[in-house]
């Protein structure tokens, strides 16, 4: 696979990838894709060099977009962040406004990144499930990969909403852990 190297570098805004919103990053998280990128596996990075981090939560410093103003609390998840564009493992990020989401009421930056991309992905899947009228009365829900990031969040959300959950993991060392919760 080639040599992988890492370095810490002082950068200016001019060094960051293009975008119309500059965000002071308060929190980010380390995701599976970040680990793949850092190890040079998975063909995640589309350009080099690049700041890692596929999500971030913070506060708008400046914006050329009418949709955001200085002081707005925001988050960015996916959309090529940390793959094609400089990511959230930095003090400041510049991103396209089309990828920026206002921080939902009742959610703070730390909590948003504690859930991170895995939580966001699980929530989107469950939202789609509910849009397709998958109710608790229709029977149990099987969650594969239940010991991983997305799966574990999905299991917790589903069980908290009254669904019967069958948690499945290919990792035998996690079977007793999943049985302990008796979803």
List each language-model region with its residue ranges.
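Mid-domain Rossmann-like dinucleotide-binding core that forms the NAD(H)/NADP(H) cofactor-binding site
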Residues: 113-183
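Residue-level marker of beta-strand positions
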Residues: 72-73, 92, 140, 160
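Cytochrome P450 core scaffold surrounding the K-helix E-X-X-R motif
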Residues: 33-39
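Glycine-rich beta-strand-centered segment in the early N-terminal region that forms part
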Residues: 12-30, 41-81
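Conserved hydrophobic/aromatic beta-strand scaffold that supports enzyme active sites
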Residues: 8-13, 57-59, 92-94, 100, ...
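Glycine/charged-rich beta-loop-alpha catalytic/anionic-binding loops adjacent to active sites
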Residues: 99-109, 136-139
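A structural motif shared across PLP-dependent enzymes of the aminotransferase-like
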Residues: 82-97
